[in-house]
Amino acid sequence: MLRRILQRTPGRVGSQGSDLDSSATPINTVDVNNESSSEGFICPQCMKSLGSADELFKHYEAVHDAGNDSGHGGESNLALKRDDVTLLRQEVQDLQASLKEEKWYSEELKKELEKYQGLQQQEAKPDGLVTDSSAELQSLEQQLEEAQTENFNIKQMKDLFEQKAAQLATEIADIKSKYDEERSLREAAEQKVTRLTEELNKEATVIQDLKTELLQRPGIEDVAVLKKELVQVQTLMDNMTLERERESEKLKDECKKLQSQYASSEATISQLRSELAKGPQEVAVYVQELQKLKSSVNELTQKNQTLTENLLKKEQDYTKLEEKHNEESVSKKNIQATLHQKDLDCQQLQSRLSASETSLHRIHVELSEKGEATQKLKEELSEVETKYQHLKAEFKQLQQQREEKEQHGLQLQSEINQLHSKLLETERQLGEAHGRLKEQRQLSSEKLMDKEQQVADLQLKLSRLEEQLKEKVTNSTELQHQLDKTKQQHQEQQALQQSTTAKLREAQNDLEQVLRQIGDKDQKIQNLEALLQKSKENISLLEKEREDLYAKIQAGEGETAVLNQLQEKNHTLQEQVTQLTEKLKNQSESHKQAQENLHDQVQEQKAHLRAAQDRVLSLETSVNELNSQLNESKEKVSQLDIQIKAKTELLLSAEAAKTAQRADLQNHLDTAQNALQDKQQELNKITTQLDQVTAKLQDKQEHCSQLESHLKEYKEKYLSLEQKTEELEGQIKKLEADSLEVKASKEQALQDLQQQRQLNTDLELRATELSKQLEMEKEIVSSTRLDLQKKSEALESIKQKLTKQEEEKKILKQDFETLSQETKIQHEELNNRIQTTVTELQKVKMEKEALMTELSTVKDKLSKVSDSLKNSKSEFEKENQKGKAAILDLEKTCKELKHQLQVQMENTLKEQKELKKSLEKEKEASHQLKLELNSMQEQLIQAQNTLKQNEKEEQQLQGNINELKQSSEQKKKQIEALQGELKIAVLQKTELENKLQQQLTQAAQELAAEKEKISVLQNNYEKSQETFKQLQSDFYGRESELLATRQDLKSVEEKLSLAQEDLISNRNQIGNQNKLIQELKTAKATLEQDSAKKEQQLQERCKALQDIQKEKSLKEKELVNEKSKLAEIEEIKCRQEKEITKLNEELKSHKLESIKEITNLKDAKQLLIQQKLELQGKADSLKAAVEQEKRNQQILKDQVKKEEEELKKEFIEKEAKLHSEIKEKEVGMKKHEENEAKLTMQITALNENLGTVKKEWQSSQRRVSELEKQTDDLRGEIAVLEATVQNNQDERRALLERCLKGEGEIEKLQTKVLELQRKLDNTTAAVQELGRENQSLQIKHTQALNRKWAEDNEVQNCMACGKGFSVTVRRHHCRQCGNIFCAECSAKNALTPSSKKPVRVCDACFNDLQG
């Protein structure tokens, strides 16, 4: 086609064709302006010039296809370009074909005129029997003028379409360039975002390291205070170590029990998660079902359009034969029987519809039940919130108890201080050690200074990093602005695409108008063929009349009268012809107006349908977006699970580290306490020995000799004591080393305390946000609180009841072991049951696969049935066409068709019965599967109940445990926090599910409204079709009646020549179309490869997502898939039944049409017989007239015999004249007979040629129908590709939205980081202030401890005002600080910790006590 266009129009059209070819190339880098200047065809990759399009195609396949195959992944972006180019090519080719046909039609009309004029001149007779056919010439000239005007209009349309094609090519090139630019910008932005995220992560790690270093930094004052407190802590730790060892053993046992309980609770939580995960999966299944329904609606609309087109074609073929014979009683009876059968089929379909409605009702009931279950879960969560509030109140009570215990601890510290005064003697010995410690303190202070310098440097680095962060934030804002701009550009491109689609639709409407005009011309051709047949019959009648006239002329009877009669008849016929032509023109104009009105209505309805389809596509995009949201929520849930696991692991590791540190500290404290006890025992022994020695000295002063001996012994003992003191000094050194280790451990403990404080603050913040928790945990917490109350009461009597509790502990351990064994047995039973259910599910899978194989066989059978029906349709059409060609053989072919149709109907009925049986079997199997699934669900419910019972028993066992402390409470709090996070995620899930359900209901309502609109449009369309049929029937009936009067003998030969030329042109067009089909096939193959690769990519992504979700919901997916497959089977069944009913209706209509044709032929035979009888009557009348004339001649002969003698001479002369005239007439008759023989030979040859031409025309029509089918298939594929393009665009939009969401989340995280940094700074400042206050209080406390009662002799003046003491000015001691004051300076009284009543106090102490 492109070669012909280039040959015909070398100027403008050639350039446009090159532009089109250049736009069809898949490379974006070639310029359009350069292509318009180049001659011939240029390869877009190697820029090689070629002579034709075929050479270019071969060159591209041979040279460049290999490279394209290797990088085939990049061709996915070129699918849109190829689709646009193929559409433009098809439009241009259709326009060129229509132009060719109309040119050929105008040329053939000219040829017909010339031939007609030549034949008219040849057949002009000397006798003047045939008159001029001026009216027909005028009509032909009018037709010529109309054809020329139409040709001119079509040329203008062609020019417009070519201009549009050029504009579209330029627009496509611009769009491609914009797309490439945006793609490069997007890639650059993505790279920047990845770099920024990496830098942010690095900076976050640096910030965390700095924070840890800041937390580990101790202050100078802290070190001093800690060193002062070491002695006090040692005494406290000595007393508490024994109790903690015992409690640690108990807590270890309880920890094991709690771990087992925690495992059971995690199992229950996992079950609840799986149950909650069912909800969104079922929603996804329903969304898939909606998508399938939408696809089925689209398929039905496409099928409806194809059927309407086929019906229009068939109606145009058979309306002529249907309207001639309306009085057929047999056909009416058959129609009534078919209507009865259709009523029965409709009843069956209604029953099936009712069954489907019941199934839908069941599904709605199930959804309502699930909604009730979600409401129950919400109620349970509200109950959990109330219980959580109770737990908060109990937690506050426990905090109060803790404060009371701390006060008790302060009292104990006061007692320890009293003991500390007794140990001053030992502190003298430790003075040397303190000197060493001072040196170490100096060293540590120097190290601290160095660390502070390092911290300052790090703070500078932090400030710099913060500035860099601010710069990066500004960069990110700029990137966001760029993304907004790209979004706006994308929206503009979408608007351009919509405008292009509107233009393409306008072009399609124009093409449909052109095709409609071509169809009208085809109908005119068929009418002319009918006129040919009628003209043949008229020729035969005229020949007979001609023979009769010659006979009369030979007889010599009234030549002038005959001529006058013929002239009168000709005048009357001409007048009738003119009147009929005028009527025809009026009716044709009215018919054209009606057709145009109907066409406008049909286009409006099509526009409505397209708008409905666009809405359906928009709904599908919304459903896809909801699916993407669901997937994102699932990914978030999985991330939360991963975070929870990581946090639990961190908690376990921290607990293990804490236990190890506690064990080390306890060991050190044990060793220190043992050493101190040994020293105290030795000191006691020494004191007792000294007392004994003094008593003996007083009693035995007289015995000096004995004393000397005793002194020697004491010297020896003294030496041993010195050795012991040396040993004690070594032990003191060891204690100093132990004290250093204790200091290090204490620093670690302080760091742990700070971390725990931070954790506590985090937990408090979470506790304010969390409002719902599980009932099981609340019961556990309540039981533990009761136990703690009992423990607080029983702490005082623990030392006496240790033995009893150990025995009880052994008994409880035995009970617990027995219970754990029972639970293990129950778990094993549950595992066995689960295994049995898994095996049963595998069996169900096998049965499902068997059902799928049966379904595939059924589908194959259905496809075979449809193929057989199509074949029968094609055979039926062939036989109808043959019946038109050969009228005499119609009866036999109709009988054969009836027999074949009956056989086919029987076969189809049998196959339908078999299909119904197989479908019933499948229904029974599906029912059995449903029953089995219900039984499995009941078993699962029973297993869950047993698990709940086991959990209740475990709760009862937990109530019997009596001793739990701070470690268990911390673990429970952490677990509660984690569970609160889980519940928040569950609430988010439920909210998403509710939103999705609302959106689904809205989508269903919109679909129902659109379906109603489509049904209304279809009803309007059917009504318009009925009116169109009626108008066509009236029009064709009147045309047939008017055209029957025409007697066009000479038009037959001209039309035969036209038909031959038509065949030649059709063959050429078929060859061109075959080439185009091959090109389209290649394009289709490439597109299929692209689509296959895209599908593979999509499948890989789907597999990656499915692998994540398979572990949670395999069983549920299988059940839902089976349900959806059953629904699909039912839908397929309904579709097949509808198609079968449609095919039956078409077969019945074909039958009725064939019967009508037979009756028409019979009527035509009867008309011919009547005409024969009329001619025979005329011949008999002529014979009677001849006999009468013979009688008259005999009478005249008798008279002539009398006058013979008189008139012999005259008679002889007249006879001679007559003989000469008769000879001349015989010669003329012989010539006329020879001409008639020649004409008959020519007519027979033409008839034979006409038969062959008709056969070839029928074959060409078949080929044309096949080509139309192929074009329809290609259009369907183009529509599918457009849908894929739209899906790709929707995916791109979704990705952009995800990017924007991710950026928004990044901004939120940045804000959160800044808030957390501020909180951290505030908390660190608060901790530092608390430390300073603690230090000041400790200093004051140490000062208060170090105060002494001042002696009267030492103080002679008031220590406040400086007055001197005398007899009148007395001394007064302050009962708080112990200093001496005058009466005025110590006039105030206040309560002190050491007295219950107010006591004399100085002004300074009074202010301190009250401040």
UniProtKB/Swiss-Prot annotation:
Residues 15-27 have a biased composition (Polar residues). The keyword Cytoplasm applies. Changing M47A: Strongly reduces interaction with RAB5C. SMART domains: FYVE. Zn(2+) 2 binds at C1374, C1377, C1402, C1405. GO terms for biological process: chemical synaptic transmission, postsynaptic; early endosome to late endosome transport; endocytosis; modulation by host of viral process; synaptic vesicle to endosome fusion; vesicle fusion. Residues 1-27, 473-501 are annotated as: Disordered. InterPro entries: Znf_C2H2_type (IPR013087), Znf_FYVE (IPR000306), Znf_FYVE-rel (IPR017455), Znf_FYVE_PHD (IPR011011), Znf_RING/FYVE/PHD (IPR013083). A zinc finger (FYVE-type) spans 1352-1410. Changing G1378A: Abolishes phosphatidylinositol 3-phosphate binding and endosomal location. A zinc finger (C2H2-type) spans 41-64. Changing R1400G: Strongly reduces phosphatidylinositol 3-phosphate binding and abolishes endosomal location. Zn(2+) 1 binds at C1358, C1361, C1382, C1385. Changing C1374A: Abolishes phosphatidylinositol 3-phosphate binding and endosomal location. It comes from the Eukaryota. Binds phospholipid vesicles containing phosphatidylinositol 3-phosphate and participates in endosomal trafficking. Antibodies against EEA1 are found in sera from patients with subacute cutaneous lupus erythematosus and other autoimmune diseases. The FYVE-type zinc finger domain mediates interactions with phosphatidylinositol 3-phosphate in membranes of early endosomes and penetrates bilayers. The FYVE domain insertion into PtdIns(3)P-enriched membranes is substantially increased in acidic conditions. Homodimer. Binds STX6. Binds RAB5A, RAB5B, RAB5C and RAB22A that have been activated by GTP-binding. Interacts with RAB31. Interacts with ERBB2. Interacts with SAMD9 and SAMD9L. May interact with PLEKHF2. This is Early endosome antigen 1. It comes from Homo sapiens (Human). The gene is EEA1.
